[in-house]
């Protein structure tokens, strides 16, 4: 099967890759007439042309379009609460997220809290609401991604920053998997090279982290196939998308790859790279951070023989005769797309931050236990420190 076939069979939601503009207008007609709330980035919606698409679809369906664009690159609790209040006040027939992962995550969280009646803070955690109300039927967001990275259009996750505690918090909730996602690759053409690089690396990390997560293989029979297809598409097309933003074939492939990556982590989750970089928001682009951390985490995983075998399955994509050579080949790919070689070259990542990262990461028992090679809690700070220091110094050449 190819990427469109995998995506068409995505469980639990509709992801439209063919005639998405018509599908959006039809969805508004089905739900309307009424109000449509569009959550967007501050400038990206105009730059990519997406806001015009929404206006046209709403007009064709006889719906009033209400736009909210005051969403930070790292959305904070107060912003999501404002979005939640807007949903409650306007009672829309549809909520649309047009943007990158930050916009989609914020909209998913706001839509959930607006309907649950719970304070937003009570949703942080895993299936907090759906475990209490398994029969609830909630309206879900329509997602239109304008980047090719997070795969939030296909996940049950929402990451929100709590400035008071200086941490990014996670909602993992099956009720926020988007009801409908529309993939319109043309909307990603306006991404500058740096954003293309960072988001593409995030998608690549999702696919590889999920593929290496051998303990979660039973969660969905096709997840590893999705991961391999995502990795293949990214290794072939990310360099082209960075070099030429209007390369339509490369942008199409990257859109598919990002969504496949989201589908992968929905069932197999991320690992230590995401854990270790969770508090680095505002200091280093998320996709760059997880990609840089992956080689050192991957080497730790090799202590699990099943990960050794899984690693060698990637040798057609990252050539090597041993697991170490495969990892080195992956790092060479990162070099080829301009990812820094070492954290010491990243001004925002200080030694003090790395020490705090090891201490805080050592408290995340669930993430440590579910890593492809579980991290013993008693040794977690030492192991995370070693991974972080290796990434700080960079791979030996």
Per-region residue spans from a language model:
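Active-site segments that bind and position negatively charged phosphate/pyrophosphate groups
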Residues: 213-329
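Glycine/threonine-rich beta-strand-loop-alpha-helix active-site module
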Residues: 78-185
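C-terminal charged capping/lid subdomain of soluble metabolic enzymes
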Residues: 315-397
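Structural motif
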Residues: 14, 35-37, 66, 93-96, ...
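Short alpha-helical scaffolding segments that buttress acidic/His motifs in well-ordered protein cores
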Residues: 204-208, 254-262, 276, 294-297, ...
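Carboxylate- and glycine-rich phosphate/diphosphate-binding segment that chelates Mg2+/Mn2+
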Residues: 157-266, 372
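ATP/NTP phosphate-donor binding region
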Residues: 1-94, 343
């Amino acid at each position: 099967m190819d990427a469109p076939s995998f995506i068409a069979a995505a469980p639990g939601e509709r992801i439209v890759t063919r005639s998405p503009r018509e599908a959006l207008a039809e969805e508004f007609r089905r739900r309307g007439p009424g109000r449509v709330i569009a959550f967007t980035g501050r400038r990206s919606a105009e730059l990519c042309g997406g806001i015009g698409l929404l206006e046209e679809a709403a007009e064709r369906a006889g719906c009033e379009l209400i736009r909210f664009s005051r969403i930070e690159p790292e959305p904070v609790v107060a912003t999501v609460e404002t979005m939640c209040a807007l949903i409650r006040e306007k009672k829309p027939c549809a909520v649309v997220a047009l943007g990158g992962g930050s916009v989609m995550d914020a909209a998913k969280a706001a839509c959930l809290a607006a309907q649950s009646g719970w304070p937003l803070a009570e949703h942080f955690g895993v299936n907090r609401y759906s475990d209490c109300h398994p029969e609830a039927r909630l309206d879900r967001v329509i997602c239109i991604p304008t980047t090719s990275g997070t795969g939030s259009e296909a996940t049950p996750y929402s990451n929100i920053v709590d400035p008071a505690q200086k941490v990014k918090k996670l909602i993992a909730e099956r009720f926020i998997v988007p009801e409908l996602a529309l993939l319109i690759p043309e909307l990603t053409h306006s991404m500058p090279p740096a954003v293309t690089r960072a988001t593409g690396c995030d998608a690549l990390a999702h696919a590889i982290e999920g593929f290496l997560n051998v303990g979660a293989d039973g969660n969905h029979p096709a997840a590893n196939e999705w991961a391999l297809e995502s990795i293949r598409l990214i290794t072939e097309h990310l360099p082209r998308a960075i070099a030429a933003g209007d390369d339509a074939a490369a942008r199409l492939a990257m859109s598919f790859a990002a969504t496949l990556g989201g589908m992968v982590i929905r069932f197999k989750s991320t690992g230590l790279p995401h854990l270790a970089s969770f508090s680095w928001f505002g200091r280093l682009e998320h996709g760059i951070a997880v990609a840089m951390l992956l080689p050192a985490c991957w080497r730790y995983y090799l202590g699990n023989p099943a990960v050794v075998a899984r690693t060698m399955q990637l040798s057609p994509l990252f050539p090597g005769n041993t697991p170490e050579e495969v990892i080195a080949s992956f790092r060479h790919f990162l070099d080829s797309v301009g990812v820094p070689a070492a954290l010491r070259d990243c001004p925002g990542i200080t030694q003090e931050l790395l020490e705090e990262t090891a201490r805080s990461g050592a408290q995340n028992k669930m993430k440590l236990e579910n890593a492809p090679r579980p991290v013993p809690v008693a040794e977690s700070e030492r192991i995370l420190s070693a991974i972080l220091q290796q990434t700080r110094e960079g791979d030996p050449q």
